């Protein structure tokens, strides 16, 4: 059987209606591949409640649909966010915004090693920042403050006090405008890897002899987190999940 092109499959998925997540309170929740695995294992365990099985299926579908819509909105060839991709990299975190028990926005972050051009020395330096890897709010829900709610929650949950220390992967003009409007971030040097790091990213830093960027200790960097807390909560049921930042 001839396989459908991936682009057509993603387009069809983007056109699906986002399912209702009746057990998920409105607000922002954080999910990792480990959380989704724990939820799946709990749903498949003997004696699992039908509601738990329904939650696992609909939550995963929500993530895949919003990821496909993000791809479509950005007009790129690759889906950046999906359940499969979250399971492939256990360090990535997905923040899901729900309103009226339906997913309306996603924000995926993770630490990556990058080589970027320093705006002062013009030389390449090695950095390992927390990166914004995908950010999308459904078109029907834009200009209602949901994007700011989602981004602010992520900053607090990741213990980021200075938004400029994040690196942004291939930001759209709309996202650059969002960052300029809400966080005053504008000046940056174009990078060959298509990540955007703002000039203020380099404030309070030095460069080691080996070319690694060293940042003065501050609460601006994301602190280590444990996915087991979310996984345990997922097994216990959606209502037991820690919905507060951090």
UniProtKB/Swiss-Prot annotation:
Domain N-acetyltransferase as annotated: residue spans: 21-202
Listed GO biological process terms: regulation of microtubule cytoskeleton organization
Enzyme's top EC category: transferase
Enzyme Commission designation: 2.3.1.108
Domain of life according to the entry: Eukaryota
Molecular function GO labels: tubulin N-acetyltransferase activity
SUPFAM superfamilies: Acyl-CoA N-acyltransferases (Nat)
Keyword rRNA-binding: no
Key words, A-Z: Acyltransferase, Transferase
Stored InterPro entries: Acyl_CoA_acyltransferase (IPR016181), Atat (IPR038746), GNAT_ATAT (IPR007965)
Protein role: Specifically acetylates 'Lys-40' in alpha-tubulin on the lumenal side of microtubules. Promotes microtubule destabilization and accelerates microtubule dynamics; this activity may be independent of acetylation activity. Acetylates alpha-tubulin with a slow enzymatic rate, due to a catalytic site that is not optimized for acetyl transfer. Enters the microtubule through each end and diffuses quickly throughout the lumen of microtubules.
Protein name: Alpha-tubulin N-acetyltransferase
Provenance organism: Leishmania infantum
